[in-house]
Amino acid sequence: MTMFQYYKRSRHFVFSAFIAFVFVLLCQNTAFARASSNGDLPTKADLQAQLDSLNKQKDLSAQDKLVQQDLTDTLATLDKIDRIKEETVQLRQKVAEAPEKMRQATAALTALSDVDNDEETRKILSTLSLRQLETRVAQALDDLQNAQNDLASYNSQLVSLQTQPERVQNAMYNASQQLQQIRSRLDGTDVGETALRPSQKVLMQAQQALLNAEIDQQRKSLEGNTVLQDTLQKQRDYVTANSARLEHQLQLLQEAVNSKRLTLTEKTAQEAVSPDEAARIQANPLVKQELEINQQLSQRLITATENGNQLMQQNIKVKNWLERALQSERNIKEQIAVLKGSLLLSRILYQQQQTLPSADELENMTNRIADLRLEQFEVNQQRDALFQSDAFVNKLEEGHTNEVNSEVHDALLQVVDMRRELLDQLNKQLGNQLMMAINLQINQQQLMSVSKNLKSILTQQIFWVNSNRPMDWDWIKAFPQSLKDEFKSMKITVNWQKAWPAVFIAFLAGLPLLLIAGLIHWRLGWLKAYQQKLASAVGSLRNDSQLNTPKAILIDLIRALPVCLIILAVGLILLTMQLNISELLWSFSKKLAIFWLVFGLCWKVLEKNGVAVRHFGMPEQQTSHWRRQIVRISLALLPIHFWSVVAELSPLHLMDDVLGQAMIFFNLLLIAFLVWPMCRESWRDKESHTMRLVTITVLSIIPIALMVLTATGYFYTTLRLAGRWIETVYLVIIWNLLYQTVLRGLSVAARRIAWRRALARRQNLVKEGAEGAEPPEEPTIALEQVNQQTLRITMLLMFALFGVMFWAIWSDLITVFSYLDSITLWHYNGTEAGAAVVKNVTMGSLLFAIIASMVAWALIRNLPGLLEVLVLSRLNMRQGASYAITTILNYIIIAVGAMTVFGSLGVSWDKLQWLAAALSVGLGFGLQEIFGNFVSGLIILFERPVRIGDTVTIGSFSGTVSKIRIRATTITDFDRKEVIIPNKAFVTERLINWSLTDTTTRLVIRLGVAYGSDLEKVRKVLLKAATEHPRVMHEPMPEVFFTAFGASTLDHELRLYVRELRDRSRTVDELNRTIDQLCRENDINIAFNQLEVHLHNEKGDEVTEVKRDYKGDDPTPAVG
C-alpha cells in the first residue's frame, strides 16, 4: 500500500541496525550451542524408550518423576522444532514461487484490460433464454463472492506482512534474551543455582535448538518479506480488477434478465390488450370495461417487473457493501493489534472512516414490505374471485341482458382467462419482490450493524490515537522545513467551465438570503426605536410586561441575522465554484454563521442601553468589559472553528499540518488567558449558583487540557473536543440569557402581585371610611421576596433543559470513553453463575465511580429539598412527617451511592457485608455511644415519639424540637437557647411530649385564705374567675378543691384546662389578677405568714419596742 511506504522508509535504518546487532548475538549463541551440545540431540526414539522404561516402573522416586517430566518436555520441544523446520521449508518454497505467481498475476491483470465490447456482450446475452441468463447471474454472484473472499485473504496477509518487522524485532530480541539465559545456565555461571540433571541439560539444549530454529525462521521471513508483499499486492490488484469486471458483467447480465422479463411481460400485456375478437365485440361496453381492467393489470405487471429488477440491483450493491464492511472489520482489528500507538495506525483509521457507508444511502424497507404484502393479498383475493370463470362472467352480465349474446359471453370468458394469467404472473412478481425486499432488509440490517460496530471501533481508536508528532524539540527544529513543505502542498483548483453556470444558479439561490438581509438592514431604524420603547417601559407597573424582555432579545437576534445570511450566501456560492475545498468552505460558512448569530446576539444584548443594562439591571461598566472580552474570545475562536471543520471532513490533512497544530496551541493559550479572569470573577460573586460555578470552571479548564493534548500529538482529539466545547459555550450563553429573562419575568410578576395587594388595601380603607395616603406608583420588591417555590421549580426546569441540551451536544462522543474499559487498573476475584472468575477494575470503572459520587452528592444536596417543595408541601401531612421522609431519603441516597461506588471499584456486597459486620462489632465497643445515638435517631424518625415543632420536657430541659440529626436532637428552650441533647436520651429516659397527640393541658392554681373565711364564697369566686376567662375550656369544667388546713391558711386548688401550650403562662397571669380583684371585692383575705417580735430587758419585765425614725437612717429605740 502507498500509505505504508513512507513509514517503511523511515524505519529502514532502525531495522537494519537492529538486525545487525541481533545477528552478532545469534552467531555467538549458535557457536556456543554447537560447542556445548557434544554432537546432535538425542533422537525421539531414544527419548521415547527412556520414557517408556520409566512409565513401566510402579514406584518412582522424586528424582525419577523429575526425569520423567524432563523427557516429556524434551519430546514436545523436538516436535516444535520439526514443525518450525517444516514451516521454514514451506516459507522458502513460498518465496521461491513468489516471482512466478507475480508474473501470472501480472499477465492476468493485463488480460483483463482486453475486455469485450459491451454491445457485443449484450447481443450475445440477448440470444439466451431467461433460465440461461438466471443461471449465469447465479454463477457470476458465486464468482464475485469468491473474489471478495480472496481479496479479504490477500488484505489480511498484506497487513500481516507490512507489520511483520515489528513482530520480528520483538521475537528476535526475546529469543536472544532467552538464549543468553540458557547459555548462562548451561555454563553454570549463575550463583546459587543447583547442578543440572542430565535430562534437564538435554531439555535445555533442545530449547536452545528450538530458539535457534525460531530465529532462523524469523530471519528467513524477514528476507522474503519484500518479495511476498510485492506478490500479494499484485494478486490483490488482479482480484480487485477482476471483482470490478465481475460486477460489470453482473450488471450486464442483470440488464439482459430485466430486458427479457420486461419483453415477456409486454408480450403478455399485448395479448391482454388485443384479443382475437372482432372490433365489434371489443366495442361492447362490458367487454371494453373488462379489457381496460386487464390493461391496468398489465401495466402493474410491467411496473412490478421493473421494481423487481431495481431490488435485485440494490441487493447486489448492499451485499457488496456488506462484504467490504466485514473485510474492513477483520483488517482493522489486526491493524489495531499490531500498530497500536503508531502514527501509521491513525492514517489507516482515517482512511477507513472515510469509506464507511452512510445510512442515508439505504432505503427503509419496512413500509415497502408491508405494501407488498398488502398488494399480494389483494391480488390473491382477485384470483380467488376468478376461480370459477362462468360464475364470475354470469355475475358481470347481470343487468346487461340487452348487451350480452353468445359472442360477448365467449369474449368475456377469454378476457377473464387472460386476467387470471396476468394475476398469476403479477402474484409471482410480487412474491419475488417480497423475497428480495426481505433479503435486502436483512442485508441492510447486517450492514448497519457491522458499520455501527466498525464506526464505534474507529471512533474510539481515532480519538485515543495520536494523529501528529508531539511538539518536542525535534518538532520545533523541523518546524520551518515542515511549514515550507506544507505551503508547497497547498493547492486550490477550480473548474471555471463548470463553475460559472453553477455560480449563477447559486447566486439566484442565495438571492433570497441577501434580500432578507437587505430588508432587515432597511428596517433597522424602526427596530431600534421599538426596542427603545420596550426599554422605557421597564420598571413601569402600567406598561411593563413579562414579554418585553423576550421581544427585545428577539429584536437583537433579528439585528444579528443580516451578517449570518450574507455568510451563508457567500458559502453557497463557494460551494458551487467547483473548488477542491468547496465542501470545506461551505461547512465552515455554516459554522461561522452560527458563531456570528450567538456572539452577535450577545454583543447586541451587552451594548450601551441595551437589554443587559435596561432589562437585567447590569452596570454599564460591566457590560463594556464583557463586550471587550467577547470580541477577543471570538477572534481567538475563529481558527479553532476552521480546523475543527477540517477534522470532521478531511482528517488525513491533519497528519502533517504543523501550521494548524502550532496555531491551535497558541490560540488555546490565548483563550485560557482570556477566560480565566471571567472564571475568577464568577467565583468572587457570592450570589453565583453552585452549578453555574462548576460549569464556568470546567469551561475554563478545558482550554488548558486541550493545549496539553495538542502538545502531545493528539491534534485530532483536540479539534473534536474543541468543537464540542465551543457548542457548549453557545449553550451557556443562550442559557444565561434565558435564565436572566426568567428571573426578570418572576420579578415583574411579584411586583404586580404586590401592586394589586396595595390597591386592595386601599379599597378596603375607602370602604371603611378611612382613606389612606396615595400608594407609591412603583413599589419595588427585592428578588429575594419572589415566591421561593416558583423560583426553585423554575430553576429545576432550567437545569433539566441545560442537561438535555448538554447531552445532545456530547452524546456522539460518549462512546469513545468506553475505550477506558480496556485500561485495567487492578483485578479482584468475583463469582458469575456460581463459578469463580477474575474481574477487572478499569479506568472506566473509576470514572463511573467518580460520576456516581458526584450524582449522589448532587442528589443529597437537592433532591430532599425539591421533594419537599414539589410533593410534600402539597400533601396534608402531620407535623414533622416531611422532615422524617427527607432525612430517611438522605440516608437511602448515601447508602445506595456508597454501594454503587464501592461495587464499581471491585468491592462487592458479599465483601462489604463481612466488613460491615466486623466494623459493627469493633466500632460497637469503641463507639458505643455514637452508634447508640445513631440507632436512636432512626427510632425517633420511624417511631416518632418527638417531631419537629413538638414541645417537650426531658430531665431539666424544656423547649421546642427544632432539628433531629443523626447523633443528636436540638431543642430551643423558652429563653431561645439551643440545647443539644443526644438521641439516646429520648429513647432511654423519661420524656414529656406536651404536643404529641393533643395540645390540651391542665393548669393548677393554688390559693390560701385566712382562717374564718367563708369557704363557699371562696369556691364561687374561684369558679367565676375561671368560667369567665375566654381561654379556659368549659369541657372539662373547671373545678375547685379544698385540699388542706395549713399552718395559717385554708388551702384551695383551682384546676382548669387550656387548649394551646402558648396560653398557659398568659392564662395563669390573667387568672391570678382576676382572683386577687374578686377576693378584695368579696372581703376574702388571702392569708400569709405573720411574725411578731418582742424584746425583753435583762430583768425580763421591760419590753422595748423598736420604732424606725422615717426621717433618718438609724432606728431609735423607744422604751415602753
From Swiss-Prot:
Q: Which Gene3D superfamilies match?
A: 1.10.287.1260, 2.30.30.60, 3.30.70.100
- Mapped to this chain, the residue ranges on the Periplasmic side of the membrane are 34-499, 582, 656-657, 714-728, 818-839, 908-921
Q: Which residues form a coiled coil?
A: 43-98, 126-266, 360-422, 1057-1081
GO terms for CC? Answer: plasma membrane
Q: In which broad location class does this protein mainly occur, judging by the first location in its UniProt entry?
A: membrane
Q: How does it sit in the membrane?
A: Multi-pass membrane protein
Ordered alphabetically, the record's keywords are: Cell inner membrane, Cell membrane, Coiled coil, Ion transport, Membrane, Potassium, Potassium transport, Signal, Transmembrane, Transmembrane helix, Transport
List the signal peptide residues.
1-33
Q: What GO molecular functions are on record for this protein?
A: mechanosensitive monoatomic ion channel activity
- Subcellular location per the Swiss-Prot or TrEMBL entry: Cell inner membrane
Look up the domain of life of the source. Answer: Bacteria
Assigned protein family: Belongs to the MscS (TC 1.A.23) family.
Functional description taken from the UniProt entry: Mechanosensitive channel that opens in response to membrane tension and specific ionic conditions. Requires high concentrations of external K(+), NH(4)(+), Rb(+) or Cs(+) to gate. May participate in the regulation of osmotic pressure changes within the cell, although it does not appear to have a major role in osmolarity regulation. Forms an ion channel of 1.0 nanosiemens conductance. The channel can remain active for between 30 seconds and over 3 minutes; it does not desensitize upon extended pressure. Its activity is masked in wild-type cells by the MscS channel.
Q: What is this protein called?
A: Mechanosensitive channel MscK
